[in-house]
């Protein structure tokens, strides 16, 4: 076991999570300036500081050559997800939104793993920054934080494949470009573009239909859809918007986000044969159609 490589990569994961937490911190600052009752900045400042500090400490273990094989990949994947869930729960605890550690850890793990189970009842009373972070965990987990690490870290070598394979399910968790870092980067670009497209459709489309969904709601709803987890900022979930347009947009994008993203890459690079002969996609469509029909008939 190459422990120095494991510690070094875990340090990078913690640093990345700390930087990602800056987004909900900015949301908290914005809504505080707008006069809304928001969570204290400290709810995010403390975990950000801890993640950046401890991450840098772990990075001191950097070996001369970062060697990652199957065993290291599995350890990094397992410990990485525990760490992000542990530190990701701190904003809930510090803000008092979910004061119980076990409940906060459950909520965060549910978010990062895109499970969508929740311990919350009165969701709408929570601060906007906490709601943003809650939905953002879905978006981060939708493609995997370790895949995100590979995508943004330069010089990710072929050994990174073992990390990506440990995290990404399915038979097509292989390369789509010669370099694994380019593969992860390409998939994340597709993921991000699709998320932005949904945000724009929800924001501007609801103005045409007369519902006028706020930008905040458009963003967090798109995060939840992208991760296919379903965290909402309303007690009645998506029904609270009273909009068939919003429901249909989410249905379509949930289906699109559930597709193996390698297929989108093949379509964009005009590798149509590889895309349309994929047995996984055909099975995915059949399962969806079958259960849609069965559930609809029983409602």
Protein language model features and the residues they cover:
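Membrane-proximal intracellular helices of multi-pass ion channels
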Residues: 1-299
